[in-house]
Design a protein with these regions (language model features):
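Conserved RecA-like ASCE P-loop NTPase motor core of nucleic-acid helicases/translocases
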Residues: 73-79, 404-406, 477-484, 608-609
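Walker A/P-loop NTP-binding motif
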Residues: 39-40, 59-72, 89-94
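Conserved helicase motor "Helicase C" RecA-like lobe of SF1/SF2 P-loop NTPases
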Residues: 484-508
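Conserved RecA-like P-loop NTPase helicase motor core
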Residues: 449-459, 509-616
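Conserved pre-motif I regulatory segment
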Residues: 2-50
Length: 657
């Protein structure tokens, strides 16, 4: 039976079970209203779209009606941190408060778990792992005797950047399935059995969509069947769906296939039934083709469409060889007389790569884009849908009783028009916008200088670097500086590196987790970052007291996927800037602001160094989408804000917990 409103209030109300069991509980009307809206969605079998600002108590707002309903649910998040919070904090808290036994299971992406087949294979050829010592192997063997699911996070002694884990982790490409010698002892299989028996399974978006694709293929499933889906941090859904509904082939995949196959060939020894020479020749040809692809794209922009010159290259003999040799590997490894499950696994991998390559090269559908991406480690070739609304309706919306999509950043200018159109959400939709519980008027200050040049001016980067230097000295470090390009990031780093008095960290110097750990530990440090640091950074307290944004975060029209989507919007007679670029930038800026205020005790300055937010006609949409914050244009106001903090601290009132 679905819960009624009284049941929900008995848990979340001002005198409810949470209030009685949780010291310092603060009743939030918005949390109760959100839970009631979701309860209605569960009862009526409807989709629910919710923006719940920071401090709303969003996770308990959806957990409560779902738990009370008794329905089987999968909760998907954009970040591992939120997964951990739900599983290890929110679910136990709700269980203690209600006295209910909540059967919940945390399930991460497969690369977070050890593969016994790869581990045994690596142990048989330890020379291939370089620095992995006998001591490491001994500790791993002992751990495998004790662990339940072989989760990477249990190995706190193994550094994040240690390449050892990449050699033994579970991957979809290298999974042998039921053919595997360790199938019965597989940690992932044990994890899935546990998940199948759980009422609530907590995953991330990548695993959620990987499951959709497996179910779409008709060959099994990763997650158990469920009635209710919750997409938390749903502002990421379009990007994740684009990746999973599309196709991708990378030079790294090709190189990994060759390396793994060569390792298996060596392990096969002198088996008389195994013809190694033809396979070795095919692997050598694949390696050469991968190098040719890297070489061709080395002199091209980092991202671009597969234009005529690129297609001409990809269709020449190099890629024809690649396709032919992949098929040859598939044939040689899949021969009936070979009963080696590892070789059959290589056959499947080679076949999948050959098929994906065909899709990418022969893609001429105007609703899809064939494009490439050049990274430090290699080249990726993509075929991506320009619109994911159709596949989402077919494979997600129509398969669930109720789907809840929620985030702190979904609405723009007070409505959900943008996210509804991008995700293809129907009319039978329940909507709710619940403002942040935090007092931005007293906790924050927004600084927008009027004396800086516009981003289109050639002196913008130098002038912004000077102003950031001034700001960070006023804030005494304690800042995250977010850029829309590496060019400006490097320009600012070059200036600050001369004589900046506080610890300075730059994205790319170390893995993301290492940088965030250093930044969090050192209160007066500064982190310069771009890209992924616009979201998913949780640093409450004084360490992050100033958030600086160099430019409004518009997606670059030079990005191939952005450009193609803009062209598609223009072709149907709509305005790509107003309908796509602007709302996406508003959501990105809201995400950035979410890094600054993470608790009711946090105080901080948001500095937007792009005057267009106050001078352009569209600037009002940014302000109407952000919480009410005092707006100032002079550095003296920033100094006064931080002086007030200093005075409050010296008077005995803590600024942060």
């Amino acid at each position: 039976m679905p819960p009624d409103a009284d049941q929900i209030e008995r848990v979340l109300g001002p005198a409810g079970l949470l209030a009685r069991s949780l010291e310092g509980f603060e009743f939030r009307e918005s949390q109760l209203a959100m839970a009631r809206l979701i309860d209605r969605g569960l009862t009526e079998g409807r989709q629910v779209l919710i923006e719940a600002g920071t401090g709303t108590g969003k996770t308990l707002g959806y957990l409560t009606p779902i738990v009370l309903s008794g329905k089987k649910a999968v909760i998907s998040t954009g970040t591992k941190n939120l997964q951990e919070q739900i599983a290890h904090k929110d679910v136990p808290l709700l269980a203690r408060a209600t006295g209910m036994e909540i059967d919940a299971m945390l399930m991460k992406g497969r690369a977070n778990y050890l593969c016994l087949q790869r581990y045994r294979q690596a142990a048989a050829t330890p020379d291939l792992l370089g620095k992995a010592t006998a001591r490491v192997w001994k500790r791993m063997d002992r751990w495998l005797q004790e662990t339940e699911f072989a989760d990477r996070s249990e190995l706190d002694w193994l550094a994040d950047e240690d390449p050892f884990w990449d050699s033994v982790s579970a991957t979809s490409e290298q999974c042998l399935g039921a053919r595997c010698l360790h199938y019965d002892d597989c940690f992932l299989n044990a994890l899935r059995r546990e998940a199948a028996a759980s009422r609530i399974v907590i995953v991330n978006h990548h695993l959620f969509f990987a499951d959709l694709m497996v179910k779409r293929s008709g060959f099994g499933e990763i997650l158990p069947r469920f009635q209710v889906g919750v997409m938390d941090e749903a502002h990421n859904v379009e990007n994740t769906a684009t990746a999973y509904f599309g196709e991708r082939v990378s030079t790294n995949q090709l190189s990994d296939l060759v390396a793994d196959a060569e390792r298996a060939v060596r392990a096969a020894g002198d088996d008389p039934d195994f013809e190694r020479k033809p396979l070795e020749r095919a692997l050598g040809a694949i390696r050469s083709a991968a190098e040719a692809i890297r070489g061709f794209f080395r002199e091209r922009p980092e991202r671009g469409t597969l234009d005529d010159p690129a297609r001409a290259f990809l269709r020449d003999e190099t890629v024809e060889v690649l396709r032919r040799e992949l098929e040859r590997v598939q044939e040689r490894c899949g021969l009936d007389r070979s009963d080696d499950p590892v070789l059959h696994g290589f056959s499947a991998r080679a076949g999948n790569l050959a098929r994906a390559l065909m899709v990418i090269l022969e893609s001429d559908d105007p609703d899809w884009l064939a494009w490439y991406e050049r990274r430090k480690t290699g080249v990726q070739l993509h075929a991506s849908p320009l619109d994911v609304s159709g596949p989402l309706r077919e494979h997600l919306y129509d398969s669930l009783e109720t789907l809840v999509l929620t985030s702190a950043t979904l609405a723009t200018d007070g409505d959900f028009h943008y996210v509804r159109s991008r995700l293809g959400l129907g009319e039978n939709l329940l909507e709710g916008i619940y403002e942040s519980h935090f007092d931005f008027a007293s906790q924050t200050l927004m600084y927008v200088p009027r004396d800086l040049p516009l981003p289109s001016r050639p002196d913008f980067a130098d002038r912004v670097a000077e102003r950031i230097d001034e700001l960070l000295r006023i804030s005494r470090g304690r800042a995250l500086v977010l850029f829309t390009s590496y060019h400006n990031l490097n320009r600012v780093h070059q200036r600050l590196a001369r004589d900046f008095p506080y610890p300075l960290y730059r994205q790319g110097e170390a893995p993301r987790s290492v940088l965030l750990n250093r930044f969090t530990r050192n209160i007066h440090s500064v982190l310069l970052a771009t890209g992924s640091f616009w979201q998913g950074v949780d640093v409450p307290g004084e360490t992050l007291s100033c958030l600086v944004v160099d430019k409004l975060p518009f997606d670059s029209p030079g990005d191939p996927l952005v450009a193609a989507r803009m062209n598609a919007i223009r072709a149907r007679g709509d305005n790509p800037f107003m309908d796509y670029q602007l709302p996406a930038a508003i959501i990105a800026l809201k995400q950035g602001l979410g890094r600054l205020v993470r608790s009711s005790a946090d105080r901080g300055v948001l500095a937007v160094l792009d005057a267009r937010i106050v001078t352009a006609r569209y600037g009002g949409q940014f302000f109407r989408s952000l919480p009410d914050m005092p707006l100032r244009h002079a550095l003296e106001a920033v100094a006064a804000f931080f002086q007030d903090d200093a005075d409050s601290t010296s008077a005995g009132r803590p600024v942060s917990p």
